[in-house]
């Protein structure tokens, strides 16, 4: 086992603002908006830059998740801790995902954003939503469960299914722990491999401003600034609801666990701006895992909670689903009884678990939900297709913050959180702290505090 270093950290010079990632991403987003607005054709042509950055991120997601989980599990003192962490994480995910669905449902009933539109479903152009609906038919509960199991041990690393990588990593990590000392050379190799992989993450993240520029220039060039105010009441309602959920609900959970959600958001500002620019919470997944470890969360907890949360803890997507479904019902004068709304809630609880952290997944999941609840016309999705791209940013931001909070909370529940380090990092002392020991076990952290 490893002890936490008590040596005084070497002083570090704060980078000038123009060399900090968050400033570069903000600047890139502004340039992208201006280009897309004044030169829409050139702006739309910038799409490959955003796509290329997302592909670079996806290239490193699988090895980051695999190495973090395997080395984290294999270094645990007791394998029962793996099941305990997973159980606590799933309990948290189920509770707050359901709460997010309920919040969206309540807000839609109170604000009534679609009332008064009186849309005739027969007059809607359904062509644009057919692709989403056809994809949604593939999203059955059985299909989702079977899709978690890869065809081979190698196939998860050449696909884009995070849960397949998670499954293989957990099984391999448990197997490595069970063989004891015989597996130590492999564990040492994987632990050594972690360092260059995370260095690769840092290198890729230097391209984040280019990716954010390309994605934002394309969005504004393709849809125009005018589409930012189209269906403004729905968009504004969704943004306010998500903000209230983060600040009030997640803020209360954070306070109960001894930290500030606002300070956590400030700590993750560069990643949040990247998510905003790319409209994909997946783009910042590797960086989130690295930063949560630096903030004092146990490596094993980070490795289990963050990747799992990207499929099971999507607070923003859940708020969007019930809010958008009721908006469509209100806009098309479709009356939903309390029973219909409860059925919608139950279906959304299941279908939302198949949503990935990529752009457009929330819209596909909404189609899957409406397909099972016949009272709400699926054709009504054409109403929100034009502004869905701009709600996608808010969905991704809320999902990202929700997973960051979940990681700290589960670490706290597991006594696997270095609380002193967390507070110092959130207070802005990150660059003056030594790097955390990557092989520290949760038990060691608990003893250190005692």
From Swiss-Prot:
Membrane-spanning ranges: 25-45, 56-76, 90-110, 162-182, 200-220, 234-254, 319-339, 367-387
Sorted alphabetically, which InterPro entries does this protein's record hold? C4_dicarb_transport, Na-dicarboxylate_symporter, Na-dicarboxylate_symporter_CS, Na:dicarbo_symporter_sf
Q: Which SUPFAM superfamilies match?
A: Proton glutamate symport protein
Question: Mind listing the GO molecular function terms for this protein?
Answer: fumarate transmembrane transporter activity; malate:proton symporter activity; succinate transmembrane transporter activity
> Can you say where in the cell this protein is located?
Cell inner membrane
Keyword Transport in record: yes
The protein's job, in short, is:
Responsible for the transport of dicarboxylates such as succinate, fumarate, and malate from the periplasm across the membrane.
Protein family per UniProt: Belongs to the dicarboxylate/amino acid:cation symporter (DAACS) (TC 2.A.23) family.
Protein name as it appears in the record: C4-dicarboxylate transport protein
Q: Which organism is it from?
A: Acidovorax ebreus (strain TPSY) (Diaphorobacter sp. (strain TPSY))
């Amino acid at each position: 086992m490893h002890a936490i270093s008590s040596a005084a950290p070497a002083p570090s010079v704060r980078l000038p603002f123009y060399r900090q990632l968050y400033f570069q991403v903000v600047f890139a987003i502004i340039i992208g908006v201006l280009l897309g607005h004044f030169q829409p054709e050139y702006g739309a042509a910038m799409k490959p830059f955003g796509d290329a950055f997302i592909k670079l991120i996806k290239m490193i997601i699988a090895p980051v998740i695999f190495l973090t989980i395997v080395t984290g599990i294999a270094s645990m003192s007791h394998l029962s801790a793996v099941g305990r962490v997973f159980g606590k994480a799933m309990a948290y995910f189920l509770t707050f995902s359901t709460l997010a669905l309920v919040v969206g449902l309540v807000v839609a009933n109170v604000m009534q954003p679609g009332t008064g539109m009186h849309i005739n479903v027969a007059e809607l152009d359904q062509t644009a939503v057919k692709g989403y609906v056809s994809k949604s038919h593939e999203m059955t509960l059985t299909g989702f469960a079977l899709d978690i199991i890869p065809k081979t041990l190698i196939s998860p690393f050449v696909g884009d299914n995070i849960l397949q990588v998670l499954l293989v990593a957990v099984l391999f990590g448990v197997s490595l722990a069970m063989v004891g000392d015989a597996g130590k050379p492999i564990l040492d190799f994987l632990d050594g491999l972690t360092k260059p992989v995370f260095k690769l993450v840092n290198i890729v993240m230097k391209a984040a401003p280019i990716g954010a520029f390309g994605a934002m220039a394309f969005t504004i060039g393709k849809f125009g600034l005018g589409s930012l105010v189209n269906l403004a009441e729905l968009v504004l309602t969704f943004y306010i609801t998500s903000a209230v959920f983060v600040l009030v609900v997640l803020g209360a959970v954070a306070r109960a666990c001894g930290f500030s959600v606002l300070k956590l958001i400030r700590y993750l500002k560069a990643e949040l701006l990247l998510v905003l620019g790319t409209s994909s919470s997946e783009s910042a997944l590797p960086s989130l895992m690295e930063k949560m470890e630096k903030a004092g969360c146990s490596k094993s907890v980070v490795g289990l909670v963050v990747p799992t949360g990207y499929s099971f803890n999507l607070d923003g997507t859940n708020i969007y689903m019930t809010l958008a479904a009721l908006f469509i019902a209100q806009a098309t004068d479709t009356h939903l009884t309390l029973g219909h709304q409860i059925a919608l809630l139950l279906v959304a609880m299941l279908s939302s678990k198949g949503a990935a952290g990529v752009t457009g997944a929330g819209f596909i999941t909404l189609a899957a939900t409406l397909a099972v609840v016949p009272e709400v016309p699926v054709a009504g999705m054409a109403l929100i297709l034009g502004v869905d791209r701009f709600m996608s940013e808010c969905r991704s931001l809320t999902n990202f913050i929700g997973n960051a909070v979940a990681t700290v909370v589960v670490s706290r529940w597991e006594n696997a959180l270095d609380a002193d380090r967390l507070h110092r990092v959130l207070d802005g002392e990150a660059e003056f702290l030594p790097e955390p020991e990557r092989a520290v076990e949760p038990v060691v952290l608990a003893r250190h505090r005692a």
